[in-house]
Amino acid sequence: MDALEDYVWPRATSELILLPVTGLECVGDRLLAGEGPDVLVYSLDFGGHLRMIKRVQNLLGHYLIHGFRVRPEPNGDLDLEAMVAVFGSKGLRVVKISWGQGHFWELWRSGLWNMSDWIWDARWLEGNIALALGHNSVVLYDPVVGCILQEVPCTDRCTLSSACLIGDAWKELTIVAGAVSNQLLVWYPATALADNKPVAPDRRISGHVGIIFSMSYLESKGLLATASEDRSVRIWKVGDLRVPGGRVQNIGHCFGHSARVWQVKLLENYLISAGEDCVCLVWSHEGEILQAFRGHQGRGIRAIAAHERQAWVITGGDDSGIRLWHLVGRGYRGLGVSALCFKSRSRPGTLKAVTLAGSWRLLAVTDTGALYLYDVEVKCWEQLLEDKHFQSYCLLEAAPGPEGFGLCAMANGEGRVKVVPINTPTAAVDQTLFPGKVHSLSWALRGYEELLLLASGPGGVVACLEISAAPSGKAIFVKERCRYLLPPSKQRWHTCSAFLPPGDFLVCGDRRGSVLLFPSRPGLLKDPGVGGKARAGAGAPVVGSGSSGGGNAFTGLGPVSTLPSLHGKQGVTSVTCHGGYVYTTGRDGAYYQLFVRDGQLQPVLRQKSCRGMNWLAGLRIVPDGSMVILGFHANEFVVWNPRSHEKLHIVNCGGGHRSWAFSDTEAAMAFAYLKDGDVMLYRALGGCTRPHVILREGLHGREITCVKRVGTITLGPEYGVPSFMQPDDLEPGSEGPDLTDIVITCSEDTTVCVLALPTTTGSAHALTAVCNHISSVRAVAVWGIGTPGGPQDPQPGLTAHVVSAGGRAEMHCFSIMVTPDPSTPSRLACHVMHLSSHRLDEYWDRQRNRHRMVKVDPETRYMSLAVCELDQPGLGPLVAAACSDGAVRLFLLQDSGRILQLLAETFHHKRCVLKVHSFTHEAPNQRRRLLLCSAATDGSLAFWDLTTMLDHDSTVLEPPVDPGLPYRLGTPSLTLQAHSCGINSLHTLPTREGHHLVASGSEDGSLHVFVLAVEMLQLEEAVGEAGLVPQLRVLEEYSVPCAHAAHVTGLKILSPSIMVSASIDQRLTFWRLGHGEPTFMNSTVFHVPDVADMDCWPVSPEFGHRCALGGQGLEVYNWYD
């Protein structure tokens, strides 16, 4: 036999799929979910954990699962065994399964039957299956024999957009077909006079003005619900559809979705709808919206299911997420908004301010200087005191804590501050702090040990008052501890404050958007053991001029650290310290994560809130350790969970330009505000939590544009990763080592996600998401991979620097550190620090004469990135970017990525550059040379010698004086016409002979492979190594014109003898190299549509290679050499 026949071909097997969830069905206490051709089985038993118990791979071949139909059992018991028909596209398969005692067994599986048309619906009929096909016909199928028993078409052979089969026997079978003419056609297949004889429709139902995507029939009440492209849901009174000639009445026309409605489901008491706007609505049968579930991202919710006994709704989205929600009557309910009826003849004056002391006591002050208390339990108002000094202008703030520590503070326009014990208001303490107006008040609490009140006066002076209580608890003591002085600004007062644990510093935010760090007491910085290395002179008394007109001068402690204008001109709204970090929010629509090192504030990460919520008002840490964001979205107050992307509470309050207060405990949440001269109160039980379950986290809401593997972490036995598979369910050879691959993905949804992919569980865990980009992210590059602690003290984990770029010519650099953490589901935690950013038009925004200049095209996109690591000590790497405006740009990273500057550029290609790739050439007795390859939409390749360019002009490594005029990159060392159209994939690999193997894939489906030689020539006018100039020459060149049927978007040379390519034709193909033209070895069909990128890497000798494919989803393959 020929030696090639004995070669073991690489056979790639799918180990993980993250695709849109297109099918859901509750069977007893189990949930079946369809994801591509795979079936996920979840246990919904309340006695155990809500978890996945099995993934059945490739059940439907190359078809996507769209639905499940369970055969009814005579005894109605589906808790032990079930016969399930799985269908999607043109495929159908029947499976008998057993799932008792938390295990899953597949008892029997039929063959995969391919229908001649699209399957819209399936229904069991006495052991057979009826199928509604795409051109308005019905097929009766025998699942045991695998043959068609009968096929009946309709006289209207139109294309259908949905269908619903009704009935339990062939004689009474009814089909409701949604035609592209926006009509519902009701007809009866059993009335056919002969086989294949068309049947005329019995009824035509009109009403929708768009295509009907889904329908649901409730037999007990004779109702039919339809969902349409016209963004509406209609409810029809149809009676018993199994009886011909019935009357149809439209009893409900429901508008609530802002986009197309994909799915609808009728329950006994509810109607569930879900659509393209990623919202699942719960309606009454009268058309009233009862609940709205928001949390999925992207292009919509594709599948819904309901568990009526447990009152659950399950949704599956385009983001690959699966969520479980509680219907009305289960879990926590909002108590709604109620007016507290303040207006009364016994309570004169107009309300000026309101605050909350805990979740059940409310304080309000009027323009007469009267302070009132409202007890939510007693539901009555009580006047605590009245002080004429606090007429007209009055600030009111309650002390933090579960019930406000029983204290509140008032301030007026004459510099007076009053601290009031709520239970004994006669023991209030007055102090005059300033000769002018008090601009703001805030409390700072350190556990139960220390309570401070900060008051801002004229000239940026902040008085710090120490509050303590007498042993009897009936009196309080107010003592001024020190004074701080804010940096100069137009509106010079603080807005919020918090203790930085362990309590040596105070973190404050001011009206100009700055975050400041102050010592919590005078003389603190004299102690060398506190605060680390503070700046010289920081915290020392400084002098500021007052604004009272008397020429008085105030002295105060200056900040030891300042982050000026961090949140823009609208100011900082809150400061929270948790887990060693400082979190700040502002009215710029962002929240920052900061930390203090050596007495200095340092930004870690900037995150955006949900779209449209530009006024962030606060941040809370909930009992499970996650955070929720408070803010205003137009005229609504919103409590938003950034992890689940869900709006937990929405209150239509009229906006944030009013007095309002928020308080939350584990038992309840309260939001009070002034509107129409009265106090309005919204309360919800359960605090800032929502009793819903995320069965599986979503990944990205839009297409994945780039996949990049960072490295591998080995977890010891103490960090064992839990597996949802039983040991006897694992596939042979899948028992790999306890390795976890860290992969970075970026997407058109403007986020960069860090994933953990264990080799043993076939699962994916999203560790964190970075949301700094303002447009789609197209490319990611990684450099500086290491371990925590560095080479001297290596620790378990992984560190790396990441550069991401995309639309609006925007680039960001950040570092990640992945460390073991047994408290998380993935047993890993990821810490992200944002280092720097760059936009091409930043310099233009700072130009005073910009009206005379031509602005850089704001639509420029970065298409690809490549990191070029220099061999010169002390210099950071270069980042090469392929740009849509025809340029190849080089950026210089300095100070470990904290400085990112444009260095050089070239417009050689004169058209959109799609790919850049860097590689090095190393030869004996010669210095290492850095080369760059770029590819454009005309199919040309250009090779640049970066080492020669840097040697000839040493000033190139210094950033240009004018950021708008970078250096020129020069002319390429070699140009090559490799393809007839755009090049979407590019890779190189050094050979043993000292050459380079270069491969490229094009939009025309072709591959181009050639061997590149780098020869060093001596210049006549130069001597030594500096006079050596590389000459690039092609030694061998081969092409495969029809390697794929569509764009080749992924390419990797695994070794000098094997190459793998991926294309939009959904084929992963292996090629043999080294024997002339690349020859076909093997091909595997993958399930990710519109694949945009691919990355392959070796894992271990036991596990072989892994390959990640990203597009409209993510799929991971592995194969053995």
Swiss-Prot record:
SMART domains for the chain: WD40
Highest taxon listed in the record's lineage: Eukaryota
Stretches forming WD repeats: 53-97, 105-143, 147-189, 200-238, 247-285, 289-327, 335-376, 381-422, 425-470, 476-520, 559-598, 604-642, 645-684, 739-785, 848-893, 901-946, 970-1012, 1036-1073, 1079-1121
Alphabetical GO biological process terms: G1 to G0 transition; negative regulation of autophagy; negative regulation of cell population proliferation; tRNA methylation; wobble position ribose methylation
Keyword line: Acetylation, Cell cycle, Cytoplasm, Repeat, tRNA processing, WD repeat
Gene3D superfamilies for the chain: YVTN repeat-like/Quinoprotein amine dehydrogenase
Signal peptide: none
GO cellular component terms, A-Z: cytoplasm; cytosol; plasma membrane
Residue numbers bearing the N-acetylmethionine modification: M1
Protein name as it appears in the record: tRNA (34-2'-O)-methyltransferase regulator WDR6
Native organism: Homo sapiens
